[in-house]
């Protein structure tokens, strides 16, 4: 009986470790996507920082809105 319980616990631990890897990769992709700028209207992505798509700099207009300076 102890062997069966131990085997189930080990299987659950291995499965949770395998399932966690794709989730971390998905989080990494979404963080990378956040770094870019929006291509339309030369507006910066809210989380892009000082970068813009065309090499211009972003100017924050508010917490959610910023625009590219020429």
UniProtKB/Swiss-Prot annotation:
Residues 1-20 form the signal peptide. It comes from the Eukaryota. GO terms for molecular function: toxin activity. The modification Leucine amide is found at residue 69. Disulfide bonds join 37-53, 44-58, 52-68. The keyword Disulfide bond applies. It holds the Pfam family Toxin_7. It is found in: Secreted. GO terms for cellular component: extracellular region. Keywords: Amidation, Disulfide bond, Knottin, Neurotoxin, Secreted, Signal, Toxin. Expressed by the venom gland. Residues 21-34 form a propeptide. The presence of a 'disulfide through disulfide knot' structurally defines this protein as a knottin. Belongs to the neurotoxin 01 (U2-agtx) family. Insect active toxin causing rapid but reversible paralysis in crickets. No activity shown in mammals. Does not show effect on mammalian voltage-gated calcium channels. This is U2-agatoxin-Ao1j. It comes from Agelena orientalis (Funnel-web spider).
